[in-house]
Amino acid sequence: CANPETQSSQPVLLHDMRKCVSCHTCEQSCPQKAIHFQKGRFHHDAQRCNGCQSCVEMCLQDALQLRGEDMESEAILHEVMKDKDYYDMSHGGVTFSGGEPFVQVTSLCEILQEAKALGLHTAVETTGNYPLADLQRAEPFIDLFLYDFKHLDDAKLLQFTHGNGQLIKTNLAYLLHQDVHKVIVRMPIITGFNDEASLVY
């Protein structure tokens, strides 16, 4: 999913209300007071949460899980290389997705460079909504760009996704000038947003 407007870059606490018995143990164990129940419903304040996982560890019903984790480049590549035989057999490789991989451009470039040194095919799912300098930095290490282009109208794009349409077009033009064969442009068709015939055809 290359939709950074819908993704958090931090680990996320998930609550399964089917398992929860509203015992309030999680609320009582949270040192940041990031959890409370209101009218029997679980509420989590992500701004206050520091990810300590006290609530997860104390929940006797396993109704809480923390998803997402910080990983060093070496750990990511170690996971990727577990499937190296499969990549070799299938002519596959590694695809960086998100959110938006370019949000962490320094780490992305480091991992891409190491992946290329290990002989891996690299692909990136992207919205193109970041500085051209970041793209220029990473582009030499990317074999394929899966470029999501959500709307041609800059105002509508800004209104619904907070994206910079001019920047997205500039980055796409740069990539197409570098090597048109490295880019697959995709436009997800979303009812009421970009499904007008003039945009699709």
Language model feature labels by segment:
Residues 1-8, 25-44, 54-69:
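Iron-sulfur cluster-binding cysteine motifs and their immediate structural context
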Residues 11-13:
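Well-ordered beta-sheet/strand-loop patches within structured domains
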Residues 24, 53, 105, 109:
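Conserved active-site region of classical short-chain dehydrogenase/reductase
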Residues 18, 46-53:
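Cysteine-rich micro-motifs
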Residues 2-9, 195-201:
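Short, intrinsically disordered, charge-balanced linker/junction segments flanking boundaries
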Residues 74-201:
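Conserved AdoMet/S-adenosylmethionine-binding subsite of the radical SAM
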